[in-house]
Amino acid sequence: MFALASMTTSGDEALNARYKESVSLSVGLCESLPEQFKLIETPINSFLLVANVMPNDDRPWDSHPASGADFHNIRMPRLERLRALIRCDRGYNNGKGGEAGQRAGEDDERMDEGVPEEGAPRSPHPPPFAHYEVYDSWSWQRALRVDKDDVIREAVAELAKPANWQGTAVEDPLPLMWLLFYGRRSFCDDPECLYRARFGHPGPLLLPNYMYRPAEDASSFLAGLCRCVRSVYGCEFGGGSHVNPAQVPFDHGRFSEALRKLGAVDDAGAYVSRQCLVCRLYRQNLMSRGIIGGRGSSIVLGGSGKKYLTREVGTRRCLELGDIALYPSYDISLILDDLEASDGLRQ
């Protein structure tokens, strides 16, 4: 063995010493636990340490599984999610995937109803769950401001490009953007809204991160716009209950037509919380301190948001995936102070 080690290491003393030490340790393991480790010399002048991690089968030779064993209650969430992803990917590769903003085909509806291709019933798969919602500096600062004119102008500039209109059922997005950012239901309805207590009016609803950056992905913005508006307002225009007519800068008839077309859009289970970012962070602070319970994604303020972090960090174990999710807490008073200083908001 030692002559072989010298030849293999080409005279490298350090490598030769490591080779000898490794083989010696392997031999010692095999001698100590002969039923678990085996050392095999390969034809290419090396050694292979094989470990037996399978339990010994000590059942009687004539034994057999109990008849009528029922394992239908055993669930493996990770394998179920993997199967759902494979099925979705197979559907898109076969040309069955719906375009952005359009209703999916019959095969996708069958999958949503919980019926596989073979016809056997199965449980519907829940949508993928993320433990964290990360908002970069640009996004969470826009989420705090009531004035969303810059977001609308940015979206209109991107939608002026024909390439961003591919695969969408929307023809007039401006009424939808106005509803989502300035409609009567687009503000926090928490009776103890901290934003209202500070500035005299409720804060804007917290939307997904990509809704504040239309220039980065106009297609995602347009698809998210359809889902969010349908979640908050439905598909019928409520007139004065939806908007303040005196503030709308275009013909009110465009609202009815734009909302009517949302009936052909698959909302994909979209849900918009009826709280602003400040109230969401306040609830997260209570969860991090263990004052209240709850579930859902944890909001993370990226970029300059790290200066608002406090020392309290809560944890929660996901019963479905087994992961540990963190709930950071934030100094809400400091966030509102900086917002007031930058935007000049007053009660």
From Swiss-Prot:
InterPro entries: Herpes_UL95. Residues 95-126 are annotated as: Disordered. Residues 106-116 have a biased composition (Acidic residues). Pfam families: Herpes_UL95 (PF03038). Belongs to the herpesviridae UL95 family. This is Gene 34 protein. It comes from Equine herpesvirus 2 (strain 86/87) (EHV-2).
